[in-house]
Curated annotation (Swiss-Prot):
This is DNA replication complex GINS protein PSF3. It comes from the Eukaryota. The keyword Repeat does not apply. Keywords: DNA replication, Nucleus. The gene is PSF3.
Amino acid sequence: MTTDYYDLDDILADSEKLTCKFNITVPGLGYLEGNPGKPIHEDTKLELPHWLSGILATVAIDEDSNINFLDLADPDIIKEKVINAIKTDPLAVDLHKLTPYYYSLILKWGNLYTDKTLIANVMNCLKARSLEIYNFSNNANKTLNNEFLYTLDEFERALFKSTSDSNKSMRKWLKTK
């Protein structure tokens, strides 16, 4: 799961909006909140796409300052309630409902803020869910009307499709032997 300039899933993940708060008044950016030509004032809260908010959250106002243009609020996908649900039963969490690009956003968030506990919890979630995805891809009858498959984010859906296709190819190859 790498970032790719031409990957549509990566573009869609980058367009997910994050809540942020401006640390300074910025002249001329009022159009971001529907006020063209006006400034965005300090402490203004907005939802901006990840591609923009990520840059503004990591760039200092000037080289002598430790203050960034804005601070990002923790998105819902990493709030304690979601992480506790993932720790308790990763198979029961509807990642697609949280965001269709859950793992991509976690990866992008992890690049901004190093949080080893978050990464470990999400990796455990992916491991548990990958095993279940593999089990479903091996048994075509099991996939009919199964709620778990509707909870997969886009990365997991691609994993399911790839695994299913590989299993079909393997069965086809074994029949020729």
